[in-house]
């Protein structure tokens, strides 16, 4: 059975079931287990001298371990591969979390702040309605790439070993890939490898959003905004999403009480936004998913023909 066909089944399974609370309230999710391992390595090794060298070693250990575990799990057969791949995709859960913010925003601003705090790391306690909406839509765009397109891409390229490698390094980056005193050196290798692994998927995500929104006329602006973005990859889907919805994203935000003035993405777009724009972003998430599924099934058909 082809890898593309396995991916197609996994995408459908994830879209249908997502992350059932009844299951993951009883079992440790694989991503949580990966995080537990990274936490132990962080606690044991991220101290004293040679932190960058230690971080490189940890990243190498994680990468080799992920590839090895993926290869072993592949021996369980196609049904297991589909199940594991579906578990490590995040389409339904992402769309659900983002839609929850729109629903909360229609109820009250305090409720919306609590809802968006579940999906972003910035300060949310004093957010205005447009800031809540921007945070939710930015999370939707970035996690569409990180949580759906990139895992699918690496599963296509490398099967379960490729998928587990990506998820492990992406989790490591989310935990230690910060430019602060504790992690600037120790998390350097994980952050750089995550940048590399997301290089193609982020641009694929951008291209699919542009295709679906007929946004080719905005391509130059998308490229300019993406290149100004603080992240070498997240700016691509965010810039495409901003223009697809005709809104401005990014801009000032607060982290740990400190205001950071980030460059606007699509600065000329509408800044006064709310639940309606979040709902349009959720619709676009599902449209990109459907396009990705269609492309995957096209690969299946081409493999059968040739």
UniProtKB/Swiss-Prot annotation:
Pathway in which the depicted protein is active: Cofactor biosynthesis; adenosylcobalamin biosynthesis
A Gene Ontology term for the protein's cellular component: plasma membrane
Cell location: Cell membrane
Transmembrane annotation, as ranges: 69-89, 146-166, 286-306
Pfam family, one: CobD_Cbib
Membrane topology designation: Multi-pass membrane protein
One of the protein's GO biological processes: cobalamin biosynthetic process
Recorded superkingdom: Bacteria
Keywords assigned: Cell membrane, Cobalamin biosynthesis, Membrane, Transmembrane, Transmembrane helix
UniProt GO MF annotations: ABC-type vitamin B12 transporter activity; threonine-phosphate decarboxylase activity
Coiled-coil region: none
UniProt record similarity statement: Belongs to the CobD/CbiB family.
NCBIfam families: cobal_cbiB
Protein purpose: Converts cobyric acid to cobinamide by the addition of aminopropanol on the F carboxylic group.
Protein name per the record: Cobalamin biosynthesis protein CobD
The organism of origin for this protein: Ruegeria pomeroyi (strain ATCC 700808 / DSM 15171 / DSS-3)
Gene: cobD
């Amino acid at each position: 059975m082809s890898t593309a066909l396995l991916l197609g089944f996994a995408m459908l399974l994830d879209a249908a079931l997502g992350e059932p609370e009844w299951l993951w309230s009883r079992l440790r999710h694989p991503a949580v287990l990966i995080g537990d391992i990274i936490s132990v390595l962080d606690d044991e090794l991220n101290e004293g001298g040679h932190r960058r060298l230690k971080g490189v070693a940890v990243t190498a250990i994680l990468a080799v371990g992920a590839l090895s575990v993926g290869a072993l799990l592949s021996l369980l057969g196609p049904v297991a591969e589909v199940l594991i791949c579906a578990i490590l995709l995040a389409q339904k859960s992402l769309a659900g979390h983002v839609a929850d913010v729109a629903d909360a925003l229609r109820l009250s601003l305090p409720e919306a702040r609590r809802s968006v705090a579940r999906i972003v790391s910035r300060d949310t306690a004093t957010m205005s309605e447009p800031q809540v909406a921007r945070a939710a839509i930015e999370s939707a765009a970035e996690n569409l790439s990180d949580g759906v397109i990139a895992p699918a891409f690496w599963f296509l390229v490398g099967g379960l070993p490729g998928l587990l490698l990506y998820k492990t390094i992406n989790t490591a980056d989310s935990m230690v890939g910060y430019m602060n005193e504790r992690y600037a050196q120790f998390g350097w290798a994980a952050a750089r490898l995550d940048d590399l692994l997301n290089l193609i998927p982020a641009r694929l995500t951008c291209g699919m959003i542009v295709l679906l929104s007929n946004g080719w006329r905005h391509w130059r602006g998308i490229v300019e905004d993406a290149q100004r973005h603080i992240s070498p990859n997240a700016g691509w889907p965010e810039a495409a999403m901003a223009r697809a919805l005709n809104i401005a994203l990014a801009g000032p935000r607060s982290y740990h009480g400190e205001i950071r003035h980030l460059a606007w993405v699509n600065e000329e777009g509408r800044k006064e936004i709310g639940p309606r724009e979040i709902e349009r972003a959720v619709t676009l998430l599902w449209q990109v998913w459907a396009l990705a599924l269609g492309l995957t099934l096209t690969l299946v058909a081409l493999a059968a023909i040739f």
